[in-house]
Amino acid sequence: MNKVKCYVLFTALLSSLCAYGAPQSITELCSEYRNTQIYTINDKILSYTESMAGKREMVIITFKSGATFQVEVPGSQHIDSQKKAIERMKDTLRITYLTETKIDKLCVWNNKTPNSIAAISMEN
């Protein structure tokens, strides 16, 4: 009888976790963070600048519209789990720029200047 109760409890807990699930779009993902907003870009990156100069280590991208965004290069202010993700975002933006892939939407933290990219959605 105790095994049945444990099984039912485990099943209920597991299904509640599965119901939450992963975000299905950049909009859902962005809504999980504070101080963020979605920018609809639908354009290629016009310029890509990478700086490794001291305290200004970052990647800056600009679009035809003049919109400018950044990705910080991982530093001492980031925990180890953030560093790989930031490096991947930087690499993704470099490849996106070089292949002239269109960026559909960006989720950005709007409490930094320029706005710092949290997530990216691309299209072919």
Swiss-Prot record:
Pfam families in alphabetical order: Enterotoxin_b
Leader sequence residues: 1-21
InterPro entries referenced in this protein's UniProt entry, alphabetically: Enterotoxin, Enterotoxin_B
Annotated Gene Ontology cellular component terms: extracellular region
Assembly, per entry: Heterohexamer of one A chain and of five B chains.
Keywords of the record: Disulfide bond, Enterotoxin, Plasmid, Signal, Toxin, Virulence
Disulfide bonds: C30-C107
Lineage: Bacteria, Pseudomonadati, Pseudomonadota, Gammaproteobacteria, Enterobacterales
Gene source species: Escherichia coli O78:H11 (strain H10407 / ETEC)
Domain of life: Bacteria
Membrane-spanning intervals of the chain: none
Role, per record: The biological activity of the toxin is produced by the A chain, which activates intracellular adenyl cyclase.
Example of a GO MF term: toxin activity
Protein name (record): Heat-labile enterotoxin B chain
